[in-house]
Amino acid sequence: MNQTKCIFYSAILMIFCAPAVHSQNLTDIYCGHLLNTETGNWLRNALIKVDQGSGRVKELASYTTVSKDNSGSSLDLSDQFCLPGLIDMHTHISEDVSGDLIEFYTISQEEQLKIGRVNARITLMAGFTTVRDVGVYIAWTDKKLRDEIDAKMTPGPRMKVAGYYLTIPGGGGEVAVPGYEGEVPDHIRAGVARGADAFREKAKRVIEGGADHIKLIASGAVLAYGSLPGSPEMTQEEIAAVVEEAQKTGIRVTAHAHGALSIKQAILAGVKSIEHASLIDDEGIELARINGVSLTMDVYNGDYINEMGLLDGMPEEFLEKNRETTEIQRANFRKAHQAGVKIVFGTDAGVYPHGQNAKQFSYMTKHGMTKLEAIQAATVRAAEVLGMSQEIGQVEEGFFADIITVSNNPLIDIKSLEDIQYVIKEGYLYKDRNKQ
């Protein structure tokens, strides 16, 4: 067992030996400072009234004094900087950090779910109240976890899930380990296809199965054997077939695409969201801009792999591909941002430890964004890409009462978002700095 995994399972023991997550249903939340994520302005002395039945904000007002009742339904955050709950647009919550892909051949879905439940709680405690989970190797694990969270059986962020990857045989979305001669479970290959008609059928099945969006693997991957990040895997015709099927039901499609050609093919095929975009060229940037395509660029992830990859058991092939893509991705992040392309916050958490998601904010500001733009990427801009711009990403009347707090102004100290003090999701208090 590698060092990171030892740390991870130690964390599991600590979590399950600790008291249950604190959950308190609130009606009145008193925020000393509340960030308007559209304007960047702070609202002083904001009183947020919550409808307990729906978990949504029913009134946003102001206060002069904090009124406390004996029911425990009010919360004094007058010394805090309050923001809407954060959104991570690229997670793998049911997976942990490991370079040993053979594990996916033998682990059961229930075992994978146990890992996911721990990671869901960790992610929520880090201030992320919504995530777009973009693929699992064991089909539908993400859906089961989503449904448990929605039923309040498991504490975690609101999840929008893909069900499984759509990928070519041996592609970046399939577990393919050189020299492995054992049995490959069917649930590992649920989305494997070749040809436009076959991919159209796979898209139909994943939609009917309950996916919130579709994740397809357009190019090679960094963390896959024999897969080259710059090389196309799916054809433009195959991608277009998936998009056409998804459009029938309004399902959104996002494409894993490192390579410049795959990025352009995905955009021309109608995909509206690109993951990684490491090797995007000027033509791809312009195509993304004029077509309103968002980029999810995980600009922190490369440093973690460089520093911890060997300890996590990652083979040299993976580490070398990571070295080849890390800095060019960051340069292209800056270019795309300067060109006016919408960039949303997404970390690839699962490749590095869950709960460290907020480390990416400082990388986004280092490579060209203002602090407000980085926060917007994880709130209002991400909500737009999810199709939830009237529900999350802001604290406004009618929106879900998802609120997090920090002790310092994140527009001055962006790293304060790495130390969340309170977490409220749908009016329920899940994290209280005084009751850890």
Q: Where is each model-derived feature located?
A:
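Histidine/acidic-residue-rich catalytic or RNA/ligand-binding cores of hydrolases
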Residues: 98-101, 142-143, 225-226, 263-269, ...
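Divalent metal-dependent hydrolysis catalytic cores, especially in the metallo-beta-lactamase
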Residues: 116-140, 155-165, 211-222, 252, ...
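C-terminal cap of metal-dependent C-N hydrolases
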Residues: 44, 378-380, 384, 397-436
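Metal-associated gating/positioning segment near the N- to mid-region
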Residues: 80-147, 151, 169-170, 237, ...
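Active-site gating loops and adjacent loop-to-helix segments of metal-dependent hydrolytic enzymes
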Residues: 95-112, 172-188, 222-236, 293-326
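Histidine-rich, glycine-flanked metal-binding segment
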Residues: 27-28, 34, 39-83
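His/Asp/Glu-enriched, well-ordered alpha-helical/loop segment
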Residues: 106, 248, 317, 324-409
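Histidine/acidic residue-rich metal-binding segments in metalloenzymes
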Residues: 144, 198-218, 222-294, 323-343
